[in-house]
Amino acid sequence: MWDPGAYELRENTGTSGLEQTARAAVRALADRDIPHLVAGGLAVQEHGYHRVTLDVDLVVPDILEAVEFLTADLSGPFVRVAGVEDRVQDRRNGVFVDLLPAGKVLRRGCQVPFPEPVEVSETPKFVSLEQLISLKLDSWSNNPVRRLKDKVDVIELIQARHLPRELNIAAPVRQHYVETWDALEAEH
């Protein structure tokens, strides 16, 4: 995918290591036949809202297996993060990779599970725009103060992509999307 605007943002903000890390992680997972999906801020960039992010979020079927395979080569780029079982770090540039549970929700109270990746690929595959917005609204609605940036991501994606009111958003958060869309439309 690699949106040109997202690429330019990473180059101009000194965060180009994100792409290097994402590519290395998905190649390592593909070598072990593990499918993945990129979510989080990197997916937000690639879907058209060019904002800074500092980590890579990967949805995988089995977090512990993915951590094991990513860190198995002691001379490879990835090392475990002490005390955090779902995160590795790229020793070349310090970028963290957070591994997210396919088919499960992030935390208690959330209602939108992460999508199930099916394709094994050596190149990054991203969650769909609809999935991304659904996940962002779910995160925000369960922690509205601390996860305000997730709501902002949705607002900015609606504006940047000129999204329609009727979008295939997950049922538990569809009303949040419609309310946000309506509020933006009312401000025009």
Show which residues each predicted segment covers.
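Compositionally biased terminal segments of proteins
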Residues: 1-188
